[in-house]
């Protein structure tokens, strides 16, 4: 059984959520054509450490960077590299922080310069599907209610939901129970209780739902090489309405798209 967090633990995780949200905003400020993904990683790691925290992803199961940076058809877990961002790309930036013994986790997919109408729709729908999932993250519901909300919204626009990857519980460990799929049926899955802390993270493909693992053993790519978007927030399950621990406000108030 999943142990709900105490209010003291949630307060520490709230600090983490703000830090990871601010980190993504710092990264977003420099996303532009001509910038390498290594530079995005450098900015994030410096900001995290300057604020007294540790990048959670660095060294996690051998992962070599502070950020997962996934461009275009890379769904998640891409490595920062000397790849130069191009006009029309999209770049998913997934950030984790360890602060005062607890983890924070959030992801945002940024457009690089001007993107085409289908790509813009993919970004908008994926982000809204996240909010639909969050609306279902209330005490008494089940993880299937979250997945159903994400899936039905995304698929209504002709997009597809990745099945092999899912959200997760979070706390002292980056990945805790329960798993939080982005598809499912109402009333199925783990029961949500007040005080549970979970990450909801839709990964939505423009084309087919199928994905494959790249040769580096980390990056997950779409099978048809069409674009994929990824948005993630950490929430506390509450009675009536989930509480956000991370937020996109710092990004959307400070970054021009």
Predicted regions and their residues:
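Active-site neighborhoods and metal-handling regions in enzymes and metal-associated proteins
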Residues: 1-257
């Amino acid at each position: 059984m999943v142990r709900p967090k105490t209010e003291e633990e949630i307060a520490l995780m709230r600090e983490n959520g703000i830090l990871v949200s601010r980190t993504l905003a710092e990264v977003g400020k420099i996303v532009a054509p001509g910038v390498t993904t290594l530079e995005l990683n450098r900015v994030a790691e410096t900001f995290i450490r300057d604020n007294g925290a540790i990048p959670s992803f660095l060294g996690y199961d051998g992962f070599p960077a502070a950020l997962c940076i996934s461009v275009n058809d890379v769904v998640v877990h891409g490595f920062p590299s000397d790849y130069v961002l191009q006009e029309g790309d999209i770049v998913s930036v997934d950030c984790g922080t360890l602060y005062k013994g607890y983890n924070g986790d959030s992801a945002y997919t940024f457009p690089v310069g001007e993107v085409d109408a289908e790509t813009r729709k993919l970004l908008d729908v994926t982000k809204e599907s996240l909010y639909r999932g969050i609306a279902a993250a209330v005490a008494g519901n089940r993880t299937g209610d979250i997945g159903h909300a994400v899936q039905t919204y995304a698929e209504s626009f002709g997009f597809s939901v990745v099945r092999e990857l899912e959200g997760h519980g979070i706390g002292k460990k980056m990945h805790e129970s329960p798993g939080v799929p982005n598809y499912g049926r109402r009333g199925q899955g783990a029961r949500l209780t007040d005080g549970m802390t979970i990450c909801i993270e839709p990964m939505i493909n423009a084309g087919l739902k199928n994905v494959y693992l790249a040769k580096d053993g980390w990056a997950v790519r779409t099978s048809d090489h069409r674009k994929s978007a990824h948005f993630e927030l950490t929430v506390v399950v509450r009675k009536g309405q989930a509480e956000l621990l991370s937020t996109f406000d710092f990004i959307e108030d400070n970054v021009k798209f």
